[in-house]
Amino acid sequence: MRNSIYESRSIYKCLREIKLCEKLSHIAIKHIMTILITMYSVGYRGKTVDFSRNSPHHRTAIAHFLNQGKWDDKAVEKILKQAVIERIYGEAERTGQPILCIVDDTIASKTKPSSQALHPIQDAGFHYSHLKKKQDYGHQAVSMLLSCNGIVLQYAVVLYDKKTASKIQIICDLAEELPEAPVKSWFLCDSWYTSGKVMDAFLAKGFDTTAALKTNRVIFPRGIRQQIGEFAKYLRKSDNNVRLVTVGSRQFYVYRYEGSLNGVDSAVVLLCYPKDSFQKVGTLTAFLSTDCSLSTQQILDLYSLRWQIEVFFRRCKSQLAFDQYQIRSSLGIRRFWLLTSLAYFFCCSVPAETPSFLAGLTFFRNQISKERISFIYFAGLHHADLDDLLALVA
């Protein structure tokens, strides 16, 4: 690859290592490199004008590449998924540590267009936001992370469209893609994904489930059919199955139920109240584990690791502008999210004693700066015109 201020040897090396250069044209690789360089830049906002600052092409060329470009994004997605599998499953085989598969969804909020808008954003709609506690307009992304021994990578991100598939079906389809876990592993999710269909799909791949439960789910204490919320009203701190458990810096009174519930033949269900809010309305939470051998403490500690996906969403939005795009086509949005996943993967793949996204982001920012300074230095040695150089870095 020729030495250019619009290119990065470090990023090109990463693209070659996962064999992406074998699947895409040189032009497509250059556009992807432009997008990745921009994503790693300080002040990046997710706008197409940001990309044009790191490209010899006009911003409309990058927009066309995302929205209508003739390149095989499915091949990129397949290569990235395989790279994530190799990294996470390889770490599990090397260390014996469990694989955690974590799923959740997030909303990329957008402004609702006028009814007279000629070109509204495709596939945008209203979705319930747990953060805002109300309906929010925009795109909903369903994400699956794979984690092992502190390494956290996004396996897939899917643009949710209720007209084509439910979120439950999306997760089941993703579970079907996974190889069987090489060690005992867990699937972690919130109450929206705790269905028998999903749990069975992951169990077939070697993943037990640890998840939140809605309090209207039905259990059968002593063979009596009751909703969790109704049953919990009769609990007392002095009951034999109620104990005080510490999770992180918080304490909870926890009742442990073992038996069947609707959709599951055998599981542990934990009914939890904060220590200072026992029996207060709205404070009950419930958790499930399909592995009945786990202790109450182990189940709650394991579920707390689901927080990794919340951290992931926050970093993608704050550092990679995951929700700030100005793209109207659904194809362009899916491609933008795919390249965001690629940027995150490369950051987490930088060799380090404790690999992390933030450490990788700092690495690429420093490398890109060094490469540009080097380019300008050697251009000066070859008597490059100063005005031309200033135009490049303007």
Map each language-model feature to its residues.
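Active-site-proximal, Lys/Arg-enriched surface segment
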Residues: Q68-N149, R250-E258
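Extended, non-catalytic structural segments that build the interaction scaffolds
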Residues: I35, G282-R306
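Basic, amphipathic alpha-helical segments enriched in Lys/Arg and hydrophobic/aromatic residues
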Residues: Q324-F375
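Short amphipathic alpha-helical "interface-anchor" segments enriched in bulky aromatics
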Residues: I107, V242-R243, T296-I327
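Gly/serine-rich nucleotide phosphate-binding loop at the start of the catalytic core
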Residues: M1-K74
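An internal, acidic/charged active-site-proximal segment
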Residues: V158-Y273, E353-T362, S369-S374
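Short, conserved catalytic/metal-binding motifs centered on acidic residues
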Residues: T48-F51, Q97-T111, M144, W186-T194, ...
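Electropositive, glycine- and tryptophan-enriched low-complexity nucleic-acid-binding patches
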Residues: A61-F65, G69, G125-K184, A267-A286
